[in-house]
Structures are given as C-alpha cells and as structure tokens.
C-alpha cells in the first residue's frame, strides 16, 4: 500500500502538543488512518538568525525536542529558509550548534532557501538532508522541474498554486514525483503577488535588519488564518484529494503549515489529516477535553 508522509509544523513551537499526541498516535493506531504516517516535524527556535518563512517562536530545549523525535522515529527538520544570508552569518553559533545536533542524530534535515547556506551545510554537516523551501515561490512549472533536477535536494516544496496542475504533475517521471512535497493547507490569497516580498520581510526581521514591515493587502487579510478559509482556497489539498488523486498518481509527501498558529488549530490539522472522523472526539478527550473544561 502506498503511504502518504505528512511533514508537520512546530518542531520547537508545539513540543508540548506533540509530547501528548505522539504517545496516543503510537498506542492507539486504531484512531488513525493506516494509509499515512508522520514523515517529519519541522520548525525553529525563537530568534534563529538563519530562520525564514515565519519568525520562529519555539522555546523548548533542543535536546528535549530531538529526544522526542528520536523516541518516535520521526525526522526533525530545521526551518532555516532565510533568503538574505551573507557569509558572515554562517558563523552563527546557535544555528551551527543545532545543525551539529541534527547531524549527530543521523536522520535530520534542513529546509532552506539560500544556496550559500546550502553549500556551507553540505560541507560542514554531511549527514543532513536538504529540502528546497516554498519561500522560493516556484510558481512556474519549468522552474519547479529545474529545482527537482538538483541532486542536493531530497524534497522540493513548490508554491501552493501549482498543487492542482494535475496534467503536468502526472506527466513527471517517478523520480521527480518522489521529491515533490505539496503544501496542503495554505491560506494565502491565491492571486497574491507579494508572497516573495512577505518572505523577504521575515528574513530581514530574523537578521535584525531594518525595513518596512510587510503589509498584506489580500482580501480578508485582517481575519488571519482560518482553516475553513484555507479549505476554500483553490490550492487546498484535502484528505480525499490525497487518497483519490495524489497517491494514485505517485505522490507521497504532503506538508502542513502552521508554525505561527496556535496549538489548538494545529491539533485540528492533526485531527483532519491523520485521524479517523469517528475517533476525533476521542483524541480531543485524550489531549485536552474533559468534563470540567469551560470555554467561557
């Protein structure tokens, strides 16, 4: 049976959630779909110079985080997708220490944008694998194929607006399909032309550099992320899409975004993508829901 591999958000940011969820996932397989598993969990601690995509907020100990991943056989990934790195930034002690820990663990990866950082990590930490970040905003199919041809990347995350270019995707050779990692639940406006500028603003912020704050001009931007709205996005990939379309076509890797969101919403992602509908209430009860919980 072909298995869908999910790549989940919040390696550091949602450590406490995963510390509760993963034992349940292991001990009650009957709650969860048997056609998918957890391929990796990605993220970055707060104030990481090499960080990008989103400003990291995780405060959990790296040793605790990596020990949890090791206990459950899950690949940890560092999100180091800053697109504006310069040579002097490569000396950052904290980011290097994190890479060394993943390198020593043997199954860790780095999500990145910068070729400068890629070359440095290849030379310095040979046990790491690399993921080409969606912050490259690969909206052109030829650009995606060129990125997939780069042997240094194990996976490539295209822009979500290519998710349903099914005729072109299906025509790919299997070797390229194996490397595609679809971003499933993006809430960004499908017609957005500022996505690259948004990511660059985050990169500047992580470097501590000045510059105007990026202002999103998308319709309904003030409402923030809503999963219900993401489900209406033309680029959304849902459970039925994965089972009926992408797996039969030979695609197996699916990324769930959400590092900047709250843990309650990330739990909803875990329920929707991993958990059988009839067991979702049981998972909620195991994680947080009891008969004395008040919302108001």
Predicted segments with their positions:
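Active-site pocket-lining/capping segments in soluble small-molecule metabolic enzymes
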Residues: 1-143, 147, 153-296
């Amino acid at each position: 049976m072909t298995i869908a591999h999910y790549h989940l958000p919040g390696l550091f940011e949602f450590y406490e959630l995963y510390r509760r969820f993963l034992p349940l996932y292991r001990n009650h397989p009957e709650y969860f779909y048997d056609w998918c598993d957890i391929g990796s969990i990605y993220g970055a601690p707060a104030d990481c110079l090499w960080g990008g995509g989103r400003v990291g907020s995780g405060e959990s100990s790296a040793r605790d985080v990596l020990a949890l991943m090791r206990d459950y056989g899950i690949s940890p990934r560092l999100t180091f997708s800053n697109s504006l790195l310069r040579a002097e930034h490569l000396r950052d002690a904290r980011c290097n220490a994190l890479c060394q820990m993943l390198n020593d663990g043997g199954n860790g990866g780095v999500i990145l944008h910068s070729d400068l950082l890629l070359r440095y990590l290849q030379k310095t930490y040979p046990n790491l694998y690399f993921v080409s970040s969606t912050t490259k905003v690969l909206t052109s199919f030829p650009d995606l194929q060129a990125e997939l041809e780069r042997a240094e990347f194990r996976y490539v995350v295209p822009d979500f607006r290519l998710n349903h270019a099914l005729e072109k995707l299906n025509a790919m050779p299997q070797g390229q399909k194996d490397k595609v990692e679809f971003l499933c639940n993006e809430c960004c406006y499908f017609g957005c032309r500022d996505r690259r500028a948004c990511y660059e603003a985050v990169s500047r912020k992580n470097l501590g550099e000045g510059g105007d704050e990026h202002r999103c001009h998308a319709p309904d931007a003030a409402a923030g992320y809503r999963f219900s709205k993401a489900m209406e996005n033309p680029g959304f990939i849902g459970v039925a899409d994965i089972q009926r379309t992408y797996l039969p076509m030979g695609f197996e890797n699916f990324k769930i975004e959400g590092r900047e969101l709250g843990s309650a919403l990330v739990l909803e992602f875990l329920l929707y993508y991993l958990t059988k509908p009839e067991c979702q209430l049981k998972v909620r009860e195991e994680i947080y829901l009891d008969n004395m919980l008040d919302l108001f």
